[in-house]
UniProtKB/Swiss-Prot annotation:
The name this protein goes by in its record: Ribosomal oxygenase 2
Function recorded in the entry: Oxygenase that can act as both a histone lysine demethylase and a ribosomal histidine hydroxylase. Is involved in the demethylation of trimethylated 'Lys-9' on histone H3 (H3K9me3), leading to an increase in ribosomal RNA expression. Also catalyzes the hydroxylation of 60S ribosomal protein L27a on 'His-39'. May play an important role in cell growth and survival. May be involved in ribosome biogenesis, most likely during the assembly process of pre-ribosomal particles.
PROSITE patterns tied to this protein: JMJC (PS51184)
Pfam family name, one: JmjC_2
């Protein structure tokens, strides 16, 4: 299932969640990105490369370097995060390990220079200047509105969590040894210049982060220098290292990453448990007990043969399944993603408003990109029977300040009987629909459905 990124720090004291603080410029540059839709945002994000070209030739295949000589775009990138922003952030309470890592690459290894507890800007700047340490700031979208705006749209576009980290490295220094990641990475160069070397993956589309020794990675397949306004993409598993050239100002870049634990293998793991449960209800062969002392045996050839037969049976059943059960992936995504970008009073966003829907109303879905529909198990606490329900999860009330920080999160949404699925799909697949036309048996059920969705701010009367 998708996992929330956890800061890889050694700070012992985590401290309370930082207060929300604005570090925006009083009058920032206008955005060159298109925020009208998720697809429009991504198209402008990788411009001038076309989206179709990107997914056909680069996505999960090879790196893409976009070097732009565009002063307006460079100015916009610089506004996303600056070294100078750290001073105001430190004054609001950020902590080593949770929010900030301070590190250097020493003899091919990462050396963490974190202090304990709260970060003080003067100490941070001293380590940066005197120890030539790299400052890694975790999940800056918690504080920077424009990064929130970008990443929220990217989460809608990819249907996967999107995290970010800022790296600020002084001249003539390198923060991290050669390594590869378990995420798809987009790098935006914000300040200064950064010299990059990319290498052939030893584990294509890697599922885990790993450091690689210099003597194992061979010669670079790509070598270049990023300047403000440039963008770099590379697939998970791509070995890389980067340094700030001597004699120049510091470098600041942000990595925007996605698709952690979002492979077909992850999706299969998420689906298979529900499929086995449903099949076992209908097929006595799966409910039969395993042979005596099976767990004590060393040989497993006969067992493997029996299991392969069950898997073939499950495959046959899967092809005819109308609704795929999801154990965690959909819920986890809805619970942990960013809330909709909204600069007004957030209370208005999550409070139902407008006309109350009735049987004669026409309604339409709101926040379509922030809602997931799934079928999952439900156990009645009164009689301990287990069945299936339709779950509607949304991210309207999610907390921006804990996004991708590994915190326990609360799920928001609704639960309906399985018989409501067709009516829910009607609402999902229509630009607008009459409540009377919903595929439910009684008018009471129709009103119950739309009132429940309206209360959660998921539909409006048109």
């Amino acid at each position: 299932m998708p996992k929330k990124a956890r800061p890889a720090g050694d700070g012992k004291e985590q401290g309370p969640a930082p207060k929300q603080v604005k570090v925006e410029a009083a009058c920032g540059p206008s955005s060159p990105l298109n925020f009208d839709s998720p697809s429009g945002l991504f198209e402008s994000f990788i411009s001038p490369i076309k989206t179709e070209t990107f997914f056909k030739e680069f996505w999960e295949q090879k790196p893409l370097l976009i070097q732009r000589d565009d002063p307006a775009l460079a100015t916009y990138y610089q506004s996303l995060f600056r070294l100078s922003d750290l001073k105001s952030l430190c004054s609001w309470g950020i902590y080593y390990g949770r929010d900030v890592n301070v590190c250097r690459c020493v003899h091919g290894k990462k050396k963490v220079l974190n202090k304990d507890g709260r970060v003080h800007f003067l100490q941070l700047r001293q380590d940066f200047d005197q120890k030539r340490a790299t400052i890694q700031f975790h999940q800056p979208q918690r504080f920077k509105d424009e990064l929130w705006r970008i990443q929220e749209k990217l989460e809608c576009y990819f249907g996967s969590l999107v995290g970010s980290n800022v790296y600020i490295t002084p001249a003539g220094a390198q923060g991290l040894p050669p390594h590869y990641d378990d995420v798809e990475v987009f790098i935006l160069q914000l300040e200064g210049e950064k010299h990059w070397r990319l290498y052939q993956p030893t584990v294509p589309l890697a599922r885990e982060y790993s450091v690689e020794a210099e003597d194992r990675i061979g010669r670079p397949t790509h070598e270049f220098t990023l300047k403000p306004g440039d963008l770099l993409y590379f697939p998970r598993g791509t070995i890389h290292q980067a340094d700030t050239p001597e004699g120049l100002a510091h470098s600041t870049h942000v990595t925007i990453s996605t698709y952690q634990s979002s492979s077909w293998g992850d999706f299969l793991l998420d689906t298979i448990s529900g499929l086995v449960f449903d099949t076992a209800k209908a097929d006595v062969a799966l409910r039969a007990g395993i042979p005596r002392q099976l767990l004590l045996q060393a040989e497993s050839i006969a067992v493997a043969t029996r299991l392969s037969g069950f898997l073939r049976m499950l495959a046959d059943r899967l092809e005819g399944t109308k609704e795929l059960p999801s154990a965690d992936m959909k819920k986890d995504f809805a619970m942990n993603r960013l809330p909709p970008y909204y600069m007004g009073d957030r209370a208005k966003l999550v409070a139902p408003g407008g006309q109350l829907p009735g049987l004669d109303s026409t309604v339409r879905l709101q926040f379509r990109d922030h809602v997931v529909l799934t079928v999952g198990p439900y156990q009645d606490p009164s009689d301990e029977t287990r069945g299936e329900m339709v779950y509607v999860y949304h991210s309207l009330r999610n907390r921006r300040d804990t996004h991708m920080m590994g915190n326990e999160t609360e799920s928001y949404g609704l639960r309906f009987p399985l018989s409501y699925m067709d009516a829910l799909k009607q609402i999902w697949n229509s630009s607008a629909i009459s409540v009377k036309d919903l595929k439910l048996t009684t008018d009471e059920e129709k009103q119950n459905l739309v009132l429940s969705l309206w209360t959660e701010c998921l539909i409006q009367v048109v």
